């Protein structure tokens, strides 16, 4: 089934030997599941059947009746996710989700300068920017200019390659 494929996708990705990649997929699993759980609760849907994955957090989302699903100490960004889940306007909601992801990537690669992880983050950020250029040309262009400026600050290109 579709749910089984999603479970397998995340399980496989979270076993990646690259710590950043496995953390990235774990982080996205948390974001997606928590937002699904809040939305399902709001519309009185069966939460358990909508949660993807087999982690302790997934189990808490499936079984807890607590307002925060008992995850306040477990999920660092829970309060942000609560606020995002309360955002009715969909484009604004998407922007907040991407901002959360963007901040997480920046935090996780703060000390990585020109590593594979930093390149992966750069590609993920370009993907986000591409989406936002389509949705909001001004904001997307701004993001693109800021990431290029940041790259110029980060990377020292040898004179012979300039």
Predicted segment positions?
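Extended alpha-helical surfaces
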Residues: 1-2, 6-162
């Amino acid at each position: 089934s579709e749910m089984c494929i999603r479970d397998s996708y995340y399980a496989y990705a979270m076993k990646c030997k690259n710590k950043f990649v496995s953390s990235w997929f774990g982080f996205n699993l948390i974001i997606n599941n928590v937002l699904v759980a809040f939305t399902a609760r709001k519309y009185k849907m069966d939460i358990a059947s909508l949660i993807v994955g087999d982690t302790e957090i997934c189990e808490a989302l499936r079984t807890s009746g607590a307002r925060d699903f008992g995850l306040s100490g477990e999920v660092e960004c829970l309060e942000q996710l609560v606020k995002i889940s309360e955002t009715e306007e969909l484009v604004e909601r998407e922007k907040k989700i991407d901002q959360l992801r963007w901040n997480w990537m920046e935090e996780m690669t703060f000390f990585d300068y020109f590593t594979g992880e930093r390149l992966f983050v750069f590609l993920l950020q370009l993907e986000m920017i591409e989406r936002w250029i389509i949705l909001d040309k001004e904001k997307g262009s701004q993001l693109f200019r800021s990431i290029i400026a940041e790259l110029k600050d980060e990377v020292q290109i040898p004179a012979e390659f300039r």
